[in-house]
A protein has these predicted regions:
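Glycine-rich, aromatic-bearing surface loops/beta-hairpins
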Residues: 82-160
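Short, solvent-exposed amphipathic alpha-helical segments in soluble enzyme
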Residues: 32, 37, 42-44, 62, ...
């Protein structure tokens, strides 16, 4: 048992987040995403989170993992297909609020890839987390940033 680890994050997912390096990516995939096929073809790690949606996992992951500050948009969604031009994507507003809570760039940190470009980027991911999310166009790719040193940590060590 550990303190301050969101309960949604499995030990395997926490391990994957720890093993990821700067600029590595993780896919938070909805229930319809071909995660198993992509992971199998690329040798990527596939983790299951069937009982959870993408928004709650996004919130839990960003509590631990910083977003990359060396790129303008470290969070990427899948663009709507032309046939879905008129389709509302309400989960986007949820993502904007969650990202803004953890990153000062807010909604500006969120970009999009065309559908097939998204699949190509997903093939490069360190890890794919397949969720039970049923919202349309709910897939995300997150790019990991760097952990900043805690200046108070050394001071605490010196007290002992």
């Amino acid at each position: 048992m550990l303190n301050h680890i969101p309960h949604l994050l499995t030990p395997e997912l926490v391990k994957a987040l720890c093993e990821m390096g700067h600029s590595d990516t993780i896919v938070l995939a909805d229930a319809n995403f071909p995660g198993a096929m992509i992971a199998r073809a690329q040798g990527a790690l596939l983790l299951r989170a069937d009982g959870h949606g993408v928004p709650e996992l996004l919130d839990a992951i960003l509590e631990l993992m910083p977003l990359d500050t060396y790129v303008d948009q470290p969070v990427r969604m899948m663009e709507k297909m032309p046939c879905d031009r008129e389709l509302e994507i309400p989960v986007l507003e949820t993502y904007k609020r969650i990202v803004a809570h953890y990153d000062p760039r807010g909604a500006a940190a969120i970009g999009a890839y065309e559908r097939f470009a998204f699949y190509e980027e997903a093939k490069k991911a360190f890890c794919i987390v397949q969720t039970g999310e049923t919202a349309v166009y709910a897939n995300l790719i997150l790019q990991k940033g760097v952990i900043q040193a805690d200046p108070g940590l050394k001071a605490r060590y010196l007290q002992y």
